[in-house]
Amino acid sequence: MALQIKSFFKELNKLQKLYGDPGLFPICGAGCTKNPRYFFLLMNPTARNVSAFSGWKGIRAPWLGTKNIWKLLFKLNLLSGKTYKKTQSLKPSQWDEDFSLKLYQELAKNKVYLTSLAKCTQKDARPLPNRVFKEYFKQTRNEIYKTKPKCVISFGNQVSSIFLGKNVKVSDYQSSSEKIIINNRAFQVFPTYYPVGQGLRNMKLAIKRIKSINL
């Protein structure tokens, strides 16, 4: 099974030139591309992702070279202890193409797909304006339709609000969800606390929320 939807690459490269750092590559979603159990939707990639640089020859996928997102997946039993420990022990410069590929192959096996609403890579973590996220709205909906996940987990107020087209407070969604229709097909969306970066303090709340979802 393919780990990425390569038909998206050309458009994402164009958008990177418009909205991302010109010296970096965009980061497309990756993982289980056919009926994943979880479709995790986060914000946007930064230069902390080691696969965003021109010298990288392997899969360009979310969160490579970072640590916190893998803790979330481990706590959700979506990542093995062995793989998790390696993500935490490696320095960014020690991540390589082989381990990164095996990591996403494991996620695919565990029915996980990771992506960002905006795929344009920035040099730092400064917030993107809503208008940039909205440029990726159509592409993200296509991403959901092509993968056909059992559920979409949208992380954070900003991502959830833009994606759902209304003001969202994730604290109001402890036991509820939203439904979206894409090409006459319904998908359940579960707004959830943002678990990394500025939202690291909310990781326990995000884990509790995701574990409460019955699929």
Spans of features found by a protein language model:
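Catalytic phosphate/metal-binding cores of nucleic-acid and nucleotide-processing enzymes, i.e., regions
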Residues: 175
